[in-house]
């Protein structure tokens, strides 16, 4: 079992305003369009949008293996600047996922990152590796993050029609 990096960040330039990009990344109901791993999300516990404390259910599936779900909680909702959520629970540890936007000469610099605040239990890591057949989770996450940002970029730069 290869040890996973505790943090990683990827970025992309987007020819759209930070507010436009924020609207895309903070609409968790669209995450299935962007992410190769997160297949669908919906707000739960009465939440209707991205505000700190709001929770949503995320259904994930790697390229191989079964699907799984979790219930992240929004920790930052700063329009045009940052959207972040925490995924945590018994045995699975805690990971904070962030999308940061900053104005750039081409529109917006968008970065996606994760930080493992508390690692999952070794047994959970082993089981995840076996079920998903992913030997290098760090490389897999990095590739998925880059694909996610590219899909968001394409959506942000495509005129609504």
Regions found by a protein language model. Give the residues of each.
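Hydrophobic ligand-binding cavity/cleft-lining segments
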Residues: 1-47, 51-52, 148
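A short, structured loop/turn motif at beta-sheet edges
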Residues: 18-19, 48-50, 75-80, 100-109, ...
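Short, surface-exposed coil-to-beta transition loops
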Residues: 7-9, 67-71, 93-97
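Short, highly charged C-terminal tails/helix-capping segments
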Residues: 43, 148-161
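Hydrophobic pocket/interface hotspot
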Residues: 20-25, 31, 56-58, 74, ...
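Beta-strand/loop substructures that line and gate deep hydrophobic ligand-binding cavities in soluble
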Residues: 89-143, 152-154
């Amino acid at each position: 079992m290869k040890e996973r990096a505790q943090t990683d960040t990827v970025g992309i330039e987007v020819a759209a305003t930070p507010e436009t990009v924020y609207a895309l990344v903070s609409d968790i109901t669209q995450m299935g369009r962007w992410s190769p791993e997160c297949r669908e999300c919906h707000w739960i516990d009465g939440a209707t949008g991205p505000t700190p404390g709001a929770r949503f259910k995320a259904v994930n599936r790697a390229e191989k293996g079964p699907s799984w779900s979790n219930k992240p909680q929004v920790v930052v909702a700063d329009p045009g600047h940052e959207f972040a959520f925490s995924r945590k629970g018994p045995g699975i540890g805690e990971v904070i996922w962030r999308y940061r936007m900053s104005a750039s000469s081409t529109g917006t610099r968008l970065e996606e990152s994760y930080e493992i605040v508390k690692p999952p239990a070794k047994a959970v890591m082993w089981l995840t590796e076996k079920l998903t057949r992913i030997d290098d989770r760090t490389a897999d996450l990095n590739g998925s993050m880059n694909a996610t940002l590219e899909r968001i970029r394409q959506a942000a730069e495509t005129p609504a029609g």
